[in-house]
């Protein structure tokens, strides 16, 4: 049986979910003097499980905060694509992910342990859970990263998931 399924397909206001997650993380951001920028189209609605979508955005933002330097910025966006789909992005200004590690970051318990990337707390399960949420929602993910230049996670929802 499938380890994760979409039990409730609802129309989800993506901008509201993103703002909600940003608000939940605001105290942590202030503590580390990190700014969260939200750029989300208020008219975007997707079909999905609300709890899982909150969890997905939270995992991606939590990782971005973990790897962001003091006085850094995390950017979260949601925009419609020309093909009718939706693109959600979460970007940080951290150290980045070595190219050779990118294919493995979605695996359970995988942690990037390189001398140029500081060690951060965590179980190594967040992105594995995120991958499953992305999959069951019919979306796809891409990671754009270069050591020293931060990381951007792009989640693309196809037009049949957009309301």
Which functions belong to the PLM regions below?
Residues 92:
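Acidic ATP/Mg2+-coordinating residue in the GHKL
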Residues 2-8, 45-48:
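Conserved micro-motifs of the catalytic ATP-binding
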Residues 97-111:
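Short conserved segment of the HATPase_c
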Residues 138-139:
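Conserved glycine-rich
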Residues 8-23, 37:
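A conserved beta-strand-to-alpha-helix junction within the catalytic ATP-binding
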Residues 71-84:
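Short beta-strand/loop element within the Bergerat-fold HATPase_c
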Residues 10-11, 30-31, 35-44, 81:
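Conserved catalytic submotifs in the C-terminal HATPase_c
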């Amino acid at each position: 049986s499938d380890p994760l399924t979409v039990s409730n397909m609802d129309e989800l206001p993506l901008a509201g979910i993103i703002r909600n997650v940003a608000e939940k993380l605001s105290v942590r951001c202030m503590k580390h003097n990190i700014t969260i920028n939200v750029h989300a189209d208020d008219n975007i609605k997707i079909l999905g499980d609300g709890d899982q979508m909150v969890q997905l955005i939270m995992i991606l933002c939590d990782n971005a905060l973990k790897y962001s330097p003091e006085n850094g910025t995390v950017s979260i966006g949601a925009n419609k694509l020309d093909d009718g789909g939706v693109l959600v992005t979460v970007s940080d200004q951290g150290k980045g992910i070595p190219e050779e590690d990118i294919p493995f970051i979605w695996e359970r318990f995988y942690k990037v342990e390189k001398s140029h990337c500081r060690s951060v707390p965590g179980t190594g399960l967040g992105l594995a859970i995120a991958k499953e949420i992305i999959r069951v929602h019919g979306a796809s993910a891409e990671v754009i990263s270069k050591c020293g230049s931060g990381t951007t996670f792009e989640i693309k929802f196809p037009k049949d998931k957009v309301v």
